[in-house]
């Protein structure tokens, strides 16, 4: 049974009527451009064919009623006419409540709704299950009530909900790619202007995500530390963000910076340049150059930003040993565990799968990987 059929069935069972519409919003993987988003830089993600699906219907009152199919049909009901505050128990409900509250703050004119939510974006793997949920809820209300909100506005609304209501600091990339993703394309995003450029992906190329299943310890505290170090470097150069520092200027005076701060800044500044080059390489179908840029990105994350861990480094090496210069591989996401992303010809996927299964557990304390073969997918919309 598809996610759409599943949510429609539960809607019928729980609410004794048919849903009006079903919408979806995808998760994402970032091909290159790591820890650049909060430095006003560039990122190159694609939406993936794992998504949050919501079947929904209008109500004739001012209640929002939500059922979480993935949490044993837990239910949340709240009023649009009372202050919207965090749920006393359900963490998932806060994402829904936050999106609704921030839509209200945008003066969006909408009434009550019944929602049934289900998703298959792996949680805790750095594939943006939360952004997928936020954009899906916004898209559901936008579609039900024909709200005059663009994809960029839905993405910003989701980011605000996560930052201010849920209390998790995040950049704009995850919500933006979920809202604006384009089938068979990556999206080059300027995180300062929010301008985007669709970048075609070569045909017959697989987007492979491998979860190391190494739990992402330290990620919150280390993320905040990295962010502070980047801000310190920007202050040193007298600019708003590291995006504004030319590589030539940085390399001419990097010795005057605190050595650790200099390493962090070097990653961000070089990663921005790599991301722009990668968009051009991908559009030209130059997988050899794309592979080199992804390799440089991983080395920079390992040595300058210091956010990889040995099992992740080994996993990257194992994949690279199979694909050579026919594709690229690097860690993706916040760091300290999580996933790697690999681009490769479809015909190499099974060889990579077999080699990783044979070699990786010896370097991970016996942990086995989880393997996802994805396609670059369309952003949020009707399902």
Swiss-Prot record:
Reported function: Catalyzes the transfer of the gamma-phosphate of ATP to D-galactose to form alpha-D-galactose-1-phosphate (Gal-1-P).
EC number: 2.7.1.6
Positions annotated to bind substrate: 34-37, 223
Catalytic activity line of the entry: alpha-D-galactose + ATP = alpha-D-galactose 1-phosphate + ADP + H(+)
Molecular-function GO terms, alphabetical: ATP binding; galactokinase activity; magnesium ion binding
A GO CC term attached to the entry: cytosol
Annotated residues for binding of Mg(2+): 130, 162
Residues where ATP binds: 124-130
InterPro entries attached to this UniProt entry: Galactokinase, Galactokinase_bac, Galactokinase_CS, GalKase_N, GHMP_kinase_C_dom, GHMP_kinase_C_sf, GHMP_kinase_N_dom, GHMP_knse_ATP-bd_CS
PROSITE patterns (UniProt xref): GALACTOKINASE, GHMP_KINASES_ATP
Enzyme class, first EC level, given as a word: transferase
Similarity field: Belongs to the GHMP kinase family. GalK subfamily.
Record-level GO BP terms: galactose metabolic process
Source lineage: Bacteria, Pseudomonadati, Pseudomonadota, Gammaproteobacteria, Enterobacterales
Taxonomic superkingdom: Bacteria
Pathway: Carbohydrate metabolism; galactose metabolism
Name the record gives this protein: Galactokinase
Localization in the cell: Cytoplasm
Sites marked Transition state stabilizer: 28
């Amino acid at each position: 049974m598809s996610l759409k059929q599943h949510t429609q069935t539960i809607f019928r069972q729980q609410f004794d009527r048919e849903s009006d519409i079903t919408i979806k919003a995808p998760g994402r993987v970032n091909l290159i451009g790591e820890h650049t988003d909060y430095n006003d830089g560039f990122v190159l993600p694609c939406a993936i064919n794992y998504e949050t699906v919501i079947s929904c219907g209008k109500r004739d009152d001012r209640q929002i009623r939500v059922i979480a199919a993935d949490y044993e049909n837990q239910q949340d009901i709240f009023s649009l006419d009372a202050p919207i505050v965090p749920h006393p128990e359900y963490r998932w409900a806060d994402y829904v409540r936050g999106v609704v509250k921030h839509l209200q703050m945008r003066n969006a004119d909408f009434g009550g709704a019944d929602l049934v939510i289900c998703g298959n974006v792996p949680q805790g793997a750095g594939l943006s299950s939360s952004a997928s949920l936020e954009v899906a809820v916004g898209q559901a209300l936008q579609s039900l009530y024909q709200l005059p909100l663009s994809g960029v506005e839905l993405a910003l609304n989701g980011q605000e909900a996560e930052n201010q209501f849920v209390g998790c600091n995040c950049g704009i990339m995850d919500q933006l790619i979920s809202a604006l993703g384009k089938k068979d394309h990556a999206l080059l995003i300027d995180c300062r202007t929010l301008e985007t450029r669709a970048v075609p992906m070569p045909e017959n190329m697989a987007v492979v995500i491998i979860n190391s299943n190494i739990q992402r310890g330290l990620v919150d505290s280390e993320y905040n530390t990295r962010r502070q170090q980047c801000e310190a470097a920007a202050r040193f150069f007298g600019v708003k963000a590291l995006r504004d520092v030319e590589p030539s200027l940085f390399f001419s005076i990097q010795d005057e910076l605190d050595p650790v701060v200099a390493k962090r800044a070097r990653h961000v500044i070089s990663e921005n340049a790599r991301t722009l080059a990668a968009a051009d390489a991908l559009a030209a179908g130059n997988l050899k150059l794309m592979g080199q840029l992804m390799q440089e990105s991983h080395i920079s994350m390992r040595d300058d930003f210091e956010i990889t861990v040995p099992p992740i480094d080994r996993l990257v090496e194992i994949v690279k040993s199979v694909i050579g210069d026919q594709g690229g591989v690097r860690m993706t996401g916040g760091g300290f565990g999580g996933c790697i992303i690999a681009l490769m010809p479809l015909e190499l996927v099974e060889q990579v799968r077999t080699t990783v299964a044979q070699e990786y557990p010896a370097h991970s304390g016996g942990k086995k990987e989880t393997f996802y073969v994805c396609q670059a997918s369309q952003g949020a919309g009707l399902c």
